[in-house]
Amino acid sequence: MIVAQRHRFRTGFTAALFCLILFCSVRAQDGPPHEEKKREADLVELTKLNKTIKLDIRYARTDNFTGQAVYPEARAFLQRDAAKALLRVHKKLKKDGLGLVIFDGYRPWRITKLFWDVVKLDERKYVADPAKGSKHNRGCAVDLSIYDLKTGSLIPMPSDFDEFTERASPDYTGGTDEERANRDKLRKLMEAEGFTVNPNEWWHFDYKDWQDYAIYDIPFDKIGRRKKP
């Protein structure tokens, strides 16, 4: 009984501390960097484009590098043009009995700020500097992999998602032939549709027109709602 109470206390304390970090990190910088003459956000939900696009939104769970759920729900959005390009990749994969699985898409700026504050200093190359904003904040970056449509399982890759090691590099030469072939297949298909792979993360791709959009901090439940005049 005492052990269970201690576990609940530690869990509750960790969650409370995490919420405090989130609050303080946002207050430390009141909002995202302001940019002029940017296109209005046109974020669309990926699963509404095609029901066979699979979600594995670990930031809505605790099995991510923060150890806490930072999203209130498992949803994924991209700017419309990027989403259409992604759908074309998905349709090409379906011919081989495969499909895209999404780890993350549009990310509110305050979450980028949180990541920056909680990650270790020597691992900050894997997260975006909130002072500059992330392409995820613009709705033009996506973290993804490939899954087998029949089994629902992820196909082998050289590393797991959000693994902060050299194995995460898109040019990593280790691992098995199958893992590297799968990784390179994903990269080839994504680059053919206007995406560029992140040099540190094989799963992270940026869409070509990301500079057209501002750095947003729109909560998921506010996406698509127009402001009243």
Regions found by a protein language model. Name each.
Residues I111:
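Short, well-ordered surface patches within globular domains
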Residues F9-G12, K208:
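Alpha-helical and His/Cys-centered functional microenvironments
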Residues G12-C24:
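Bacterial N-terminal signal peptides
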Residues P108:
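Segments that shape or occlude catalytic/ligand-binding pockets
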Residues F205:
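Conserved metal-phosphate-binding beta-hairpin within the catalytic cores
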Residues M1-R8:
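N-terminal secretory signal peptides that target proteins for export/translocation
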Residues A28-G105, V118-N200, D209-P229:
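Extracytoplasmic cell-surface/polysaccharide-interacting catalytic and binding patches
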